[in-house]
Each structure stands twice: as C-alpha cells, then as structure tokens.
Amino acid sequence: MKGYRNFIIIFSALFILYVIAELNKPKPVDWTVTISKNDKNPYGGYIIYNRLKDLFPGVQMRSYYLPVYNQLNNIREKNTAYMILTPSFDPSKYDYREMMNYVRQGNYVMVSAEDFGKAFLDSLKIKTNSRFSMQNKDSSKVNFVNPLLKLEKAFTFLSFTMTQYFSKLDTAKTTVLGVNDRDEPNFIKIAYGKGALLLHAAPICFSNYFMLFATNSMYTARALSYVPPGISKIYWDEYYKITNEPSSTPLRFFLKNENLRWALRLAMAGLIIYVL
C-alpha cells in the first residue's frame, strides 16, 4: 500500500510540473481573421475598436452579440452607425429588412466582409468576385477614388492578398468609394432613404496588423470618414465574428489544449491503476 501511495505522489508531482510547464510555454501566434474588439492577435480588431472614439469624439460605443434583427428591431434613432467587420456576413431576410429600415431612418451601416451571403447580395442587386492570379503574390494594394483621400502609390499590405471585389453594381444607387490594385471596386456606398449602406470587401484593412503596417492606419481612418463625423452612437457587432473566447471552465481549458488533454488522460489512467 505504501508503494502505491509513493507512486501516486510522484505521479501527481510530475503531472503538476508538466501542467505548469505547458501553461508557461510561449503561445503560437494566432493568425485567424476575427476583427474582434478583444483580439490583440494580428488579425483581431483591438486597435480599430479602441481608436473609434478618437475618430468620432464624444460618440457612445455599444457592443452587440446577437443578430442584426434582434438588435435593431427596437431602435428608432437617427444619426447613428452600425459596424460589422467580419470575415463572412450572411444575414437572414429578417436581418436584412431590419437593417435597411434602420438605414432608411437616417443611419449608416458599414459592413466589411470577404464573403457576403448570396441572398444579401441579390437583394441589393450586386455581385462579388475573387480574382485569381497565376502569379505568386504576397502583397496587395488598395486605394480610394476621391482625389482628396487617395494616395499616389496606393496603400500596400504585405503577407495578405485582398482579391475580393464587387463585379456587378446597381449603378442607380451605388457610388464607388475604393478600389484594389486593378481598379476593381472593393468599397461602395449604397444610398437608401436618409442614410446609407457602406460595403467593403477587405475586412483585413481593419485588423491590428494592417493598421500597424506603414501608413495604413491612414487608410482605415479615411475609409471610416464616410461615416458622418457627428454620429451620436456606434453599434459594434461581435455576433458575426469568428472569436476565440477563453474557456469558461477549467475542464474546457484542458480539453482545448492537445498536450494538456493527453496529460489529463495519463493522470486519469494513473488514478485507475492506483485504485485497482
């Protein structure tokens, strides 16, 4: 019995040391595109979220974690903005209807996504496309149409190619605001009622990494300048993002980490051997 006791003590000590080592091991960089307000990784949105109050002095910030319909169906305001910066945006028909009612009242919605839902695009009579190139490119360029905002040599971003663009537009209602390196529209404005819908096809332009590269923070600020500076509130979406929230329980933390998951299995096996 004493031998078993020594075994479990030694095994437990080794297990604890292993867990401590794993917890202190440097974490690999997460390159997932989230544009989430709490994400400080390269493609998170920590910087842009915390800069919004500088770009819109005095504005009230509110974060939402539910679909557009659930958030906007009770809002009857003017002069506010709803920002959805996400890799993919595919709202339901109810979300779309509520969003456009919100815009019609005199508000602005800005959606930046690389992938838009087909039903959403069809409702607006627009289409997107992704340019394929035989060349192995490791950088992209974006710029504005307005001479007062555009750079002579465009805004450049390394390590990420931005190939999505709007291939078909409803020209009666749409204004092209920005283009990619082939002068294909990737930033447009659709007037509706007393407000407008701003669609942007390169959400990476609002990421931490993009904004810290060269003068690219200037691009982000200028893109947001199409939202009226005197707005009273900004509703920031977190629902449509890919987030990496911390585990809510110790068990989930162990199960998410492969090494700790195996350590937990070994510990359980050791306890079973001890009991037997």
Regions found by a protein language model. Give the residues of each.
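Long alpha-helical segments found as membrane-embedded helices
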Residues: 1-56, 60, 72-91, 95-100, ...
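Membrane-embedded segments
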Residues: 61-145
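Juxtamembrane amphipathic/hinge helix adjacent to a transmembrane helix
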Residues: 64, 221-254
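Flexible, charged surface loops at secondary-structure boundaries
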Residues: 73-79, 103-104, 168-172, 191-193, ...
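Short, solvent-exposed loop/turn segments at secondary-structure junctions
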Residues: 116-117, 204-205, 241
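Catalytic beta-strand/loop cores that center a nucleophilic Ser/Cys/Thr
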Residues: 143-201
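Membrane-proximal, cysteine-centered motifs at transmembrane boundaries in secretory-pathway
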Residues: 199, 204-225
